Every structure is written in structure tokens, then in C-alpha cells.
Amino acid sequence: MIQLKTLVNCIDNSGAAIVECVNVLRSKRPAKVGDRIVVVVQKQRNFGPESGPGGAVSISAANKVRRGDIRHAVVVRTAKKYQRPDGSVVKFDDNACVLINKAGEPIGTRLNGIVAAELREKKWSKILSLAPMHL
């Protein structure tokens, strides 16, 4: 469950590594898998050889977002246990999201890691098609 001030991993290649939830859209309850949230980019992901330990850390041209940007995101994994209709219980190791634009399309072109199958019920099939595996 994701609520205000929760730090969430960003698993796409948009350039964000860690984001902070500032609002759960269309709900007064905490966000679950498939819910849309508003986030602020807290930490950027470094790409390329120039961002190594010996070199100067630079903002790569591959980054589509910067630190401090306010974006929409979809929750794809939560650390809180939840029960599926068939009785199985699912729990992930971390909280993760995918950044999207205002139209609901993912900003990144590749996802790292698995996503929950509940995204299919919430009509996020574009995110499911980018993911390497869904559980």
C-alpha cells in the first residue's frame, strides 16, 4: 500500500530511480497495484560510462525526467500482502512503479523486473506488454 511520502522504486528506463508519492488519484485510501499516483522524482538513475565511480556524475541525455519533476505513475508492485480471488496471497519485496504521461502511456520503453498480473484487470495492458514477466 502506497500513501503520502512513501518512497517507491521506479523500474522503467525513464531516468528516475526513486520517487516519492505525493498524492493518490481518485481515492482517499492507500494505493494498491494498478492505481495511479502522483510522484516527485527524488533520485535519478545514472546511465553510461561517464557516471562511473571515478568520473564526474552527469545528467545523461537518456534521462527523460530530472530530480524534482512531478509526474504520474502506476503502482506495479507492493510490499503489502494481498489476496487474489482464487485464494492465493501475493507479496513482493519492494514497492515499485512505472512513470506515465498524462495520456496514460509509459514514459520509458523498457521495464526491469516483474509486475503484478492485476494490471490486466485495471486496463494497463501496455505496461504488461513491456514487462519481461508478470506474476
Which residues does each predicted region cover?
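Ribosome-associated RNA-binding proteins
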Residues: 1-135
